[in-house]
Amino acid sequence: ARYLSCQNPNDEDACGKCPNCVKFDKLAHPDLHFVFPVVKKKSSKETVSDDYLPEWRELLKETPYFNLPMWLQAMGTENQQALIYVKESDEIIRKLSLKSSQGGYKIMIIWMPEKMNTECSNKLLKLLEEPPAQTLFLLNAMYIAAKKMMK
């Protein structure tokens, strides 16, 4: 994802030094969006990934390799079920309907898409099949779930 936004990429990787690379390293590039399972907050009727974005960034900075129990602990919601709710699909559609702030790709990283509820996945199907120009979806499914889907 960083490579696509790099202002000075080489043949193998992003430069790591341009303003876009620095923003990607901080997980704060305006055209980089994350979607991941969340636990509904009691204070909010509809919870979306952005509500937990600081915790997400912190965990990713600590370790790029983690699982759902580690994520639940980072959110402070152990022993609760995390899902990607239908409101998230509205947020994805809204974010991707905007122009790229840097003039390049809009990148949507969806971690554990298998945790989407049915309503959410149905609303996103058309968008995934025919994304807007210069839009990239990266879906990162858990290995076990992906293996089951292949059978």
Question: Where does each model-flagged region fall?
Answer:
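Short regulatory helix/loop adjacent to the ATP-binding pocket of P-loop NTPases
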Residues: 119-128, 144-151
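Short glycine-/polar-rich loops that comprise or flank the Walker A/P-loop
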Residues: 27-31, 103-105, 131-135, 145, ...
